[in-house]
Swiss-Prot record:
Binding residues annotated for ATP, in chain numbering: 11-19
Entry's localization field: Cytoplasm
EC category: transferase
Gene behind the chain: cmk
Protein name per UniProt: Cytidylate kinase
Reaction equations catalysed: CMP + ATP = CDP + ADP; dCMP + ATP = dCDP + ADP
Entry's EC annotation: 2.7.4.25
GO annotation (BP), single: nucleobase-containing small molecule interconversion
Entry-linked PANTHER family: CYTIDYLATE KINASE, CYTIDYLATE KINASE/PANTOATE-BETA-ALANINE LIGASE
Organism of derivation: Ligilactobacillus salivarius (strain UCC118) (Lactobacillus salivarius)
GO molecular function, one term: CMP kinase activity
Keyword annotations: ATP-binding, Cytoplasm, Kinase, Nucleotide-binding, Transferase
Amino acid sequence: MVKKLQIAIDGPASAGKSTVAKLVAKKLGYIYCDTGAMYRAVTYAALKANISLDDDEALKNLLQDFKLEFVPAEPEQKVFVNGEEVTQIIRTPDITNNVSLVSAQPSVRQDLTHRQQEIADNGGIVMDGRDIGTTVLPNAEVKIFLVASVEQRALRRYKENIAKGIDTPLEVLEKEIAERDYKDSHRKISPLVQAKDAVKVDTTPLTIDEVVNEIMNIIEERNH
């Protein structure tokens, strides 16, 4: 029987991680764990509770009763926080622009890292985020680091937003993505860095199918 692998896909904002991770998981019949949605869900709960987003102690208390569920659905899995469906609301600009601050808090990273490791324990998982290959699943058999130019990533985010009825100017998105890159790669705990044993894939010139095929080839090589 082929061993069920842990597959870590990391990279900056809008590099195509979740789109690619979902497709790879589907091809392999693996579970997909969207760690970005987990941090967004905590950000949503904190904003709703009027907690200061850099108050580590208050966030720690919030997480004690924080129930997060992913429910399989088409076209994408649904996300629930304490029984409330938040699938769409956690993708709004208010959450997007605040999630880096919440993600930088030690108690939040510790709590969610533990939850993510529990989900991945049995293998057969594709997990995407910023620190999966370095911190969450350091022993993952396959580690991918996706990159793309700021311009290309802003264009992708712009198209996604338009499809959802959000019209943020392209230059604003470029600025926001560059700022998120800086915050993500300069935070003290689990900054965004490529794991030493990760394979870098530049998605700028590639279609989604081409990226998926490249990753499937890497997985194939590692599995023999």
